[in-house]
Amino acid sequence: MNKTAISIIVFFIGQILNAQTLEKMNWFNEPSSWEITDGKLKMSVTPKTDYWRISHYGFTVDDAPFYYAEYGGEFEAKLKISGDYKVRFDQAGMMIRLDHENYIKTGIEYVDGKYNLSTVVTHQTSDWSVIALDRPVDAIWIKAVRRLDAIEIFYSFDDKEYVMMRNAWMKANHPVKIGMFAACPDGDGFDVTFSDFTVTHLPDKVRTGWLEQNAE
């Protein structure tokens, strides 16, 4: 068997495993319409939903669709997002969630006719940071790396070159729910597709450091 044939087989095995992984995940606030095909999650986002706590606006909401799996330890997570954003605050991306008072949501958000790279970090109250884009984009990749008590967040337009957009605190040594979210605070919903979702375990830095210092 030549290398090309082996590469094709490995690719399709990866696609199958990815699809099986998506099938085993869980919903929080399941939307009325969604499907998983060919390793992609497609959903119609529930209208008038969001994730936010208290600050600036004075309200707390925790009712948008979130499709997740639970992971402990340190990891690198990545996904691709493509959405048909329509009105102000339409958003989609990755969420890393400890509980209803502690979470990070990051991805793309449509505000006043412009696309923004958006991150909301919530610990009791929410903050919001954005990077405005100078043009619409068909898709974006988000990557999150959890190390110790921090999560580094990166974006890419081609899944090759990644740029850091945020470094945020998250309590160490606690399992988190991680996956795909979308919200539509103002509108009547929109369609979004998630693909290439992966979570890769990373060896714990403290433990590996101890092993190195105490090698036989």
What residues fall within each predicted segment?
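Bacterial Sec-dependent N-terminal signal peptides
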Residues: 1-21
